[in-house]
Swiss-Prot record:
PROSITE patterns: T_SNARE (PS50192). Its main location: Golgi. Widely expressed. Highest levels in heart, liver, skeletal muscle and kidney. It comes from the Eukaryota. One of its GO terms (cellular component) is SNARE complex. Vesicle SNARE required for targeting and fusion of retrograde transport vesicles with the Golgi complex. Required for the integrity of the Golgi complex. This is BET1-like protein. One of its GO terms (biological process) is regulation of retrograde vesicle-mediated transport, Golgi to ER. The modification Phosphoserine is found at residues 9, 37. InterPro entries: BET1_SNARE (IPR039899), T_SNARE_dom (IPR000727). Keywords: Coiled coil, Golgi apparatus, Membrane, Phosphoprotein, Protein transport, Transmembrane, Transmembrane helix, Transport.
């Protein structure tokens, strides 16, 4: 009779252990699914950011081209002669004064 009771209790223990294993396997599967979803979200976000950076690269390239051309033209004007230098200095002074006047007017309109 003792052997039969032992067999019955070991069967109950096996059943409890089996249920616990199934519960833990389901929990693990849920965590793996969440991790997979996070990995896919990170992948999508990375692709979006790469596209954005590629767009910025082309924008910076075009701006660099524009600035290079402007600097070359400015250098040519600066080298061309004394009269041009006087004109260039006068234009610079006018632009600086206009900047200060506009900044003063904008600060007055904000308050």
């Amino acid at each position: 009779m003792a052997d039969w009771t032992r067999a019955q209790s070991s069967g109950a223990v096996e059943e409890i252990v089996d249920r616990e294993n199934k519960r833990m396997a389901d929990s693990l599967a849920s965590k793996v699914t969440r991790l997979k979803s996070l990995a896919l979200d990170i992948d999508r976000d990375t692709e979006d950011q790469n596209r954005y950076l590629d767009g910025m690269d082309s924008d910076f390239t075009s701006v660099t081209g524009l600035l290079t051309g402007s600097v070359k033209r400015f250098s040519t004007v600066a080298r061309s002669g004394r009269d041009t230098r006087k004109l260039l200095c006068g234009m610079a002074v006018v632009l600086i004064v206009a900047f200060f006047i506009l900044s003063y007017l904008f600060s007055r309109t904000r308050t």
